[in-house]
Amino acid sequence: MEKQENVGHIVQIFGPVIDVQFPNEHMPAILSALEVKINDESIIFEVAQHLGEGIVRAIAMSMTYNLSKGLEVYDTGSQISVPVGKQVLSRMFNVLGQPIDGGKPLDSFIKNPIHANAPTYLEQKATSEILVTGIKVIDLLIPFIKGGKIGLFGGAGVGKTVLVQELINNIASKHGGLSVFAGVGERSREGNDLYFEMKKAGVLDKTALVFGQMNEPPGARMRVALSALTMAEYFRDYENQDVLLFIDNIFRFTQAGSEVSTLLGRIPSTVGYQPTLSTEMGQLQERITSTIRGSITSVQAVYVPADDITDPAPATTFSHLDAKTVLDRGIAALGIYPAVDPLASSSRALEPNIVGKKHYLVAKKVVQILQRFKELQDIIAILGVDELSESDKQVVARARRIRNFLSQPFFVAQKFSGIQGQFIKIQDTVNNFDELLSGKYDNIPEEAFLYVGTIDQALEKAKKMGWSEKN
């Protein structure tokens, strides 16, 4: 390439960061890709700072083993670019858009730079169409909007990744559009499992996967979400598609940015995070939107450090989301999955003019009963249920049935649980909870409502437990 005639030399190396001396009049632009060739391999860096006197500081996108001072560095003259278009479907890539699935190299393809401007106000399009997930607790209480941004918040081990995988299974297989999955700083094993699950489910041919896992340097983890988003944007803007973008885990994007910020010598902000946290998050999130050409619906898993929802990383993500789904360790400890906390979760789509009046009223009533149940917990812990008034006893009994009925067997978990996964239509969910609220099933054992899809299945389970309608 002609642009590679601009050659510099490494003058300093510290971990995944290098300083490179270029001629003063030929310093590479910020965000330019630099290339170091060593032992028949190529290491790509991205320019992050100009230090002056012709020296630039750059972040590595892969491991920096075998680097040494004095090595030649080539300015590619362009930003990091990744392949886009139909050739990326059914394939797995790294942050640089290189296939990592052992498949054949891509033929001729289009490449787009990973950095781009967000759509303008005139290009954006608002929508209020509900995205059906088939998961009762989500469809009833936290409905997702097509073209919206959805966050799944939770600490370690409460079921975020399993919920993301179930959403991929339910939505990707039902909606028929294209999907892009970004594995950001998570376990390689989970990526491997997801790849084969999607292959088995027959949705891989409509999906592109991009991974920058937790064993990779911070530069790769910070940019991999942008690589995946670039692929999704092409489908939206040039092929007029409705795209699903799954990101697991958006916290690792922030965490990688924090590591890079420290390596670049920036003074840390609150709780040690980078001072540019809001800017970096905004630049990513504002590109994820619906336009007049197509839509991107994003589902993002958000790790909550030490279960502290006020931590700057999850708190910064909140403001960009249309629906907030909070997973709770206490609910998981009860053995209720998905461990969604209905009282901490919210969605701007839960409005009567969007979901319908009946759906809205049923959802509000469910939340009211669960809220009252929570208020009574301290009294129950001290005095016991017997000391409650008759009306409160009824609330407690009904709330326990509702809480159990919000659980659901997942398709992606059936090989572990042995229970067949369930996809429940919204209308069935609303009608079932409406009947449950009416007291029609107050005499059915509350255990019968655990891990069933519908009321009819709960009745069958109750009969197997020895319950009869005469009871």
UniProtKB/Swiss-Prot annotation:
Subcellular localization: Cell membrane
Enzyme class: translocase
Membrane topology of this protein: Peripheral membrane protein
Alphabetic keyword roster: ATP synthesis, ATP-binding, Cell membrane, CF(1), Hydrogen ion transport, Ion transport, Membrane, Nucleotide-binding, Translocase, Transport
GO MF term list: ATP binding; ATP hydrolysis activity; proton-transporting ATP synthase activity, rotational mechanism
Chief location bin: membrane
Domain of life per record: Bacteria
A cellular component annotation (GO) from this entry: plasma membrane
Tagged with keyword Membrane: yes
Protein residues bound to ATP: 154-161
Reactions catalysed, as given in the entry: ATP + H2O + 4 H(+)(in) = ADP + phosphate + 5 H(+)(out)
Keyword Ubl conjugation set for record: no
EC number: 7.1.2.2
Subunit (UniProt): F-type ATPases have 2 components, CF(1) - the catalytic core - and CF(0) - the membrane proton channel. CF(1) has five subunits: alpha(3), beta(3), gamma(1), delta(1), epsilon(1). CF(0) has three main subunits: a(1), b(2) and c(9-12). The alpha and beta chains form an alternating ring which encloses part of the gamma chain. CF(1) is attached to CF(0) by a central stalk formed by the gamma and epsilon chains, while a peripheral stalk is formed by the delta and b chains.
Function, in words: Produces ATP from ADP in the presence of a proton gradient across the membrane. The catalytic sites are hosted primarily by the beta subunits.
Family, as annotated: Belongs to the ATPase alpha/beta chains family.
The protein, known as: ATP synthase subunit beta
Lineage: Bacteria, Bacillati, Mycoplasmatota, Mycoplasmoidales, Metamycoplasmataceae
Encoding gene (name): atpD
